[in-house]
Amino acid sequence: MAKKSMMNRDIKRTKIVKKYKAKRLELKKIIKSINVSDEERFQATIKLQALPRNASPTRQRSRCSLTGRPHGFYRKFGLARNKLRECTMNGEVPGLSKASW
């Protein structure tokens, strides 16, 4: 089981990413635009850098919904590999069964 503080930190990051998502997209659009002057582009870059670090979606970490484990995570199920296996063996994941041929 992951530390509660780490899991809470990721939840906090998710909230911050949602809060600044529109602003980040707007600034990135200005930076990538060809029609914008160099000065405007430079100002947009400075504003983007002034945003909190945790506002960047790359700082988020996908975690298992049961254990909080950050590695071996399957997005489709929202579980880490070991918990996915346990849930599958118990028949808790619909449509998933152990392979046999």
From Swiss-Prot:
Q: Does the keyword Repeat apply?
A: no
The Swiss-Prot or TrEMBL record annotates one GO molecular function as:
structural constituent of ribosome
Q: What does this protein do?
A: Binds 16S rRNA, required for the assembly of 30S particles and may also be responsible for determining the conformation of the 16S rRNA at the A site.
Q: Which HAMAP family match?
A: Ribosomal_uS14_1
Please give the name of this protein: Small ribosomal subunit protein uS14
Binding partners and assembly: Part of the 30S ribosomal subunit. Contacts proteins S3 and S10.
Q: Which GO terms describe its cellular component?
A: cytoplasm; small ribosomal subunit
Keyword list, A-Z: Ribonucleoprotein, Ribosomal protein, RNA-binding, rRNA-binding
The UniProt similarity line reads: Belongs to the universal ribosomal protein uS14 family.
NCBIfam families this protein is in?
PRK08881.1
Task: Give the matching InterPro entries.
Answer: Ribosomal_uS14, Ribosomal_uS14_bac/plastid
GO BP: translation
Query: Coiled-coil segments, which residues?
Result: none
Gene name, Swiss-Prot/TrEMBL: rpsN
